[in-house]
């Protein structure tokens, strides 16, 4: 019954490709219009119960789904809906019950990813605890394994990459002056978060575990923490955005650009070798974390980021002519990746275009920055770019990512982007006879 209800929903929810288009997420409606989507659920009561007041408007991210909500929530479908809710609830909480529950509940996801067995209990417990106390663990990790010296060094790298980007924007030959000016304003207002935050959020002071001898369980403690987290999250509704707030913990190997805040974030855990090390050459560091830094800056000007202004508001600051030029260049990037074979499947160029644009801009800008250093080695730059994308994965997992991930496969990120840069051919002696050769007129350059 749960699967039957899922089938009722599936035709009306966005695909991964549609979800990758941020512009279609913003569909503001008056609250009175929103609550009329269905007479089967009291949407007014649900929303006001969450935020404690009645909003003027609601941003509907998936309007097609809501258009069909009354067709889905019928009296005939109620038994299916009930089963679906029960299954969703059990699956979401099973990891906090017995070890047998934890292992059984992961069967479906393990099949999708090609994983043979459940994560060991001790490791799962670590991830559960570190996930719950993520900012606390991140603070410890950042101070112990990264430190102030590396933090200051990386902050200087970020500022240098921003300067390179600013110079490129000012010298850009396909943007008009009005769009250039707006782009530089956005760049000048870019927020930077490196390493770890200056303080742990006050929310974590409220997390008090009740031990087993006092009647506490893993599930009961988790539910209390979840309620506190949701209360904290909804308390921020309709208040000014705090751009200094960290959303990702410092012990996470990742980096990102937040288009709604115009902020770039580099947690301490990604600021380690091979991405970055004080023991590596400057060229290796620029081919690693330098390219990642510039990649995140590039997201401010990719097909999604370009839609938002310096404050993170959806606001078209492009002239029509410049936007058409950009869209044509983005289409060239789509075509470069679309249909590339991988893991018995093919890359979706449209799904991955924003990340591919960011990779291209990041690699190119990082190389320009590397050239200003006295110990320049373009070979080390490209070799470390390839090194940071080393990956081990089952074919089933790779096939899953082809369907849902906005990133191209790691191997293709390593090997396709360098082909767009002339220095790659000069450094490694690539000629028309080599498989990695790409004719000059086919090399994609945007930023």
Where do the model's predicted regions map?
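Noncatalytic, helix-rich "gating/capping" subdomain that lines the substrate-entry/channel surface
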Residues: 1-160, 197
């Amino acid at each position: 019954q749960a699967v039957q209800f899922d089938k009722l929903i599936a035709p009306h929810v966005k695909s991964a490709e549609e979800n990758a288009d941020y512009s279609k997420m913003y569909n503001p409606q008056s609250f009175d219009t929103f609550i009329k989507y269905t007479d089967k659920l009291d949407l007014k009561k649900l929303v006001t119960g969450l935020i404690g007041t009645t909003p003027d408007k609601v941003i509907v991210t998936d309007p097609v789904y809501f258009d069909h909500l009354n067709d889905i929530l019928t009296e005939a479908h109620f038994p299916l809906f009930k089963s679906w809710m029960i299954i969703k609830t059990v699956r979401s909480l099973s990891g906090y019950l017995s070890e047998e529950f934890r292992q059984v509940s992961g069967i479906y996801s393990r099949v999708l990813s090609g994983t043979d067995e459940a994560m060991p209990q001790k490791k799962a417990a670590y991830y559960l605890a570190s996930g719950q106390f993520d900012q606390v663990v991140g603070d410890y990790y950042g101070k112990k394994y990264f430190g102030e010296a590396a933090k200051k060094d990386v902050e200087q790298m970020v500022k240098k990459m921003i300067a390179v980007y600013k110079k490129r924007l000012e010298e850009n030959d396909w943007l008009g002056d009005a769009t250039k000016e707006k782009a530089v304003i956005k760049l000048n207002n870019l927020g930077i978060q490196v390493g770890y935050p200056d303080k742990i959020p006050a929310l974590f002071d409220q997390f008090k575990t009740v031990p087993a001898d006092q009647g506490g369980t893993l599930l009961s403690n988790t539910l209390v923490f979840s309620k506190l987290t949701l209360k904290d999250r909804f308390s921020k509704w309709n208040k000014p955005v705090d751009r200094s707030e960290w959303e990702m913990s410092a012990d996470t190997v990742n980096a990102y650009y937040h288009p709604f805040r115009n902020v770039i974030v580099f947690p301490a855990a990604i600021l380690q070798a091979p991405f970055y090390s004080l023991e590596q050459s400057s060229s290796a560091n620029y081919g690693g974390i330098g390219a990642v830094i510039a990649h995140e800056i590039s997201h401010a000007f990719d097909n999604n980021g370009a839609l938002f202004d310096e404050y993170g508001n959806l606001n078209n600051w492009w002239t029509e002519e410049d936007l058409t030029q950009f869209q044509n260049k983005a289409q060239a990037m789509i075509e470069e990746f679309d249909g590339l074979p991988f893991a018995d499947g093919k890359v979706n160029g449209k799904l991955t275009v924003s990340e591919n644009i960011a990779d291209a801009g990041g690699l190119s800008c990082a190389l320009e920055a590397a050239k200003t250093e006295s110990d320049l080695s373009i070979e080390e730059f490209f070799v470390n770019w390839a090194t940071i994308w080393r990956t081990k994965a089952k074919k089933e997992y790779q096939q899953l990512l082809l369907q849902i991930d906005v990133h191209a496969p790691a191997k293709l990120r390593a090997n396709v982007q360098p082909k767009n840069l002339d220095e790659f051919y000069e450094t490694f002696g690539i000629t028309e006879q080599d498989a990695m050769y790409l004719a000059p007129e086919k090399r994609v350059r945007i930023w």
